[in-house]
From Swiss-Prot:
Component of the small nucleolar ribonucleoprotein particles containing H/ACA-type snoRNAs (H/ACA snoRNPs). Residues 1-29, 144-203 have a biased composition (Gly residues). Non-catalytic component of the H/ACA small nucleolar ribonucleoprotein (H/ACA snoRNP), which catalyzes pseudouridylation of rRNA and is required for ribosome biogenesis. This involves the isomerization of uridine such that the ribose is subsequently attached to C5, instead of the normal N1. Pseudouridine ('psi') residues may serve to stabilize the conformation of rRNAs. The H/ACA snoRNP complex also mediates pseudouridylation of other types of RNAs. The H/ACA snoRNP complex mediates pseudouridylation at position 93 in U2 snRNA. The keyword rRNA processing applies. It comes from Coccidioides immitis (strain RS). GO terms for biological process: snoRNA guided rRNA pseudouridine synthesis. This is H/ACA ribonucleoprotein complex subunit GAR1. Belongs to the GAR1 family. It comes from the Eukaryota. Residues 146-198 are annotated as: RGG-box 2. Disulfide bonds: none annotated. Residues 1-32, 124-203 are annotated as: Disordered.
Length: 203
């Protein structure tokens, strides 16, 4: 499942050093050799050329993978997504043209298209509400005998938080903060688990 594998990649940044939608986009880009997808969806409209690339405004409610192939309406490939820019409610992206495509040959308003399997829902990059303070109280009242196990799960939650940090469209926007909170939850989860484990040992 290419889309699922993509969504579990290591980042919504451009290139390896930018946080790695490159990992997902790279795998997606390899599929281009098998031809364009059966159907394509509107991804964005051309705004202007900059440094040899096409700068576009997104007209799709979802977020494109980095390195995702971009097409014209007739499925002619024109390049790949290079960067995703702007706040989550006003997304822009750039297209690195493939050989033979000139960025200045397009005019404002020209549409670009993408395969549906190269998109992620915006919700993946929105901050999640913090759990109510009372949620942790039942764990404390459950007894020390089970504290060690719960502490372990607290650590695991932090582990899941870390990929969100790596996987952030917010590496340059909002998602990075989520990752940070995920990491913070990990550190909090760790001491809670540790203290319970210690208390159990003393018991």
């Amino acid at each position: 499942m290419a889309s699922r594998g993509g969504s579990r990649g290591r980042g919504f940044g451009t290139g390896a050093n930018r946080g790695g939608f490159s990992a997902r986009g790279g795998r997606g880009g390899m599929q281009q050799s098998f031809g364009p997808p059966t159907t394509v969806l509107e991804m964005g409209s051309f705004m202007h050329a900059c440094e040899g690339e096409m700068v576009c405004e997104s007209i799709n409610p979802k977020i494109p993978y980095f390195n995702a192939p971009i097409y014209l309406e007739n499925k002619t490939p024109v390049g790949k997504v290079d960067e995703v820019l702007g706040p989550i409610n006003q997304v822009y992206f750039t297209i690195k043209p493939q050989e033979g495509i000139v960025a200045t040959s397009f005019k404002p308003g020209d549409k670009f298209y993408i395969g549906g399997d190269k998109l992620l829902p915006l919700e993946k990059f929105l901050p999640k509400p913090k759990p109510p303070p009372g949620v942790s109280k039942p764990k404390k009242a459950a007894g020390t005998g089970r504290g060690g196990v719960r502490g372990g799960r607290g650590g695991a939650r932090g582990g899941r938080g870390a990929p969100r940090g790596r996987g952030g469209f917010g590496g340059r926007g909002g998602g990075g903060a989520r990752g940070g909170r995920g990491g913070g939850f990990s550190s909090r989860g760790g001491p809670r688990g540790g203290s319970r484990g210690g208390f159990r040992g003393r018991g």
